[in-house]
Structures are given as structure tokens and as C-alpha cells.
């Protein structure tokens, strides 16, 4: 009887670990920003279970070792599950992904930071020390630099092959891949995410998502970088 007990305890612990990991990875698909932007948490247990979390700083899913219990919902069994839950978080410049630093130890000033969860700029009181570059002098500067450029609404419509029986090559914008792809159009019905040629699709939907290549950085950021360069020289 005593020899059976350790086996049951082992099976029970494995069941609990599997349940915890399963629950953590069952996030619904879509823009789950509150879940995906949580920091990675391997939990207090000591198992080493290969899992995946969404990294706000690289804006991609990365592997980590889950301890097997507790932790948080930013925890997925597979890379595919992580991508499925978090792919809709739009890409923004690196400094806009940083968490705001509200420590106050110097001259107080009102500034704005980009909130990756809400994709908006919010006001905060900057203390002037240990701050990062996610801070802007006003809301307009913040939004102009950080807010993702949006394509027309119909670019986000799903692929629709239509209602008839023809077989015509058309192109649609795939928001998940952020690229234009070919599909077979049946000749009638469908939606506006339907282009006769690849060039029109790219011009309408892809270019609208890209930020200007030579976009100037806000003066505040340039000033901070010049100051850092001067300090290194002395």
C-alpha cells in the first residue's frame, strides 16, 4: 500500500501541472493586450516546462521555462497559441513599447507617454530622473511618433470569394500577415477587400501601414541623445 502512495502523488502533481499550464494557455484569439503585455512569470514551482510568452519589448512571442504553477495568463503551450492570442497588437517604434517611469527625484514636469495597451498617449508627471525615452512634451508629438498608421477599414475585411462560380485571380490584404495575397474570386458578391492587381492592393493597404522612413524624432529625444553623447566624451 505504501509503495503505491508515491506513485499516486506523482500522478496527481503531473495532473496539476498540466491543468495549470492548460489554463494559462487558453487565452482567446485576438487583441488581448492586457494579457499579452503582462511580464513573464515562471511561478514559484520548480518544474521546467517549455512555454511561450509575448514580449512587449520585441513585440514577438518568446520561449521561457514555466515552473508549473501560478504565474500569469501571458503563458502559452506553443508558439502558435501565443501568436494566435497576441498577433493583433500593432507594431510601434521601440521607445513606445517601454513602460513609463514615474519616479520623482528632480524637477517635476507634465509630459506624455505612449500606452501600448490602449494605443493612446497619456499624461503623467515626470520626475526627471531614471526616466526612459517613452516621454514626450505634448500629446500631439507623442501620437505622431508612436501611433500606428492605419489603412482604410475595408483592408481589415476577411477574404470573401463571392457567390458565383467563376474563377478569377484577385488580391486581398491579409491583416495578420500584413501583406497582399492572391485568392480565387468567383465573380460576384464579396467585399471591398478585393483588388484586380497586386499593385493596387499594396498601394491602398500596405503603404498606409508603413510609417515614413525618414520620420524625424521629437526634439526632446534628440536633445537627450546629444546629452548622453557629451557625457561619454568626458
Swiss-Prot record:
Residues 1-22 form the signal peptide. InterPro entries: Kunitz_BPTI (IPR002223), Kunitz_BPTI_sf (IPR036880), Prtase_inh_Kunz-CS (IPR020901), TFPI-like (IPR008296), TFPI/VKTCI-like (IPR050098). Keywords: Blood coagulation, Disulfide bond, Glycoprotein, Hemostasis, Protease inhibitor, Repeat, Secreted, Serine protease inhibitor, Signal. The record marks 46-47, 106-107, 165-166 as: Reactive bond. Disulfide bonds join 36-86, 45-69, 61-82, 96-146, 105-129, 121-142, 155-205, 164-188, 180-201. One of its GO terms (biological process) is blood coagulation. It holds the Pfam family Kunitz_BPTI. CDD domains: Kunitz_TFPI1_TFPI2_3-like, Kunitz_TFPI2_1-like. GO terms for molecular function: serine-type endopeptidase inhibitor activity. GO terms for cellular component: extracellular space. It is found in: Secreted. Glycans are attached at residues 115, 167, 184. Residues 36-86, 96-146, 155-205 form the BPTI/Kunitz inhibitor domain. Finds in a complex with ABCB1, TFPI2 and PPP2R3C; leading to the dephosphorylation of ABCB1. This inhibitor contains three inhibitory domains. May play a role in the regulation of plasmin-mediated matrix remodeling. Inhibits trypsin, plasmin, factor VIIa/tissue factor and weakly factor Xa. Has no effect on thrombin. This is Tissue factor pathway inhibitor 2. The gene is TFPI2.
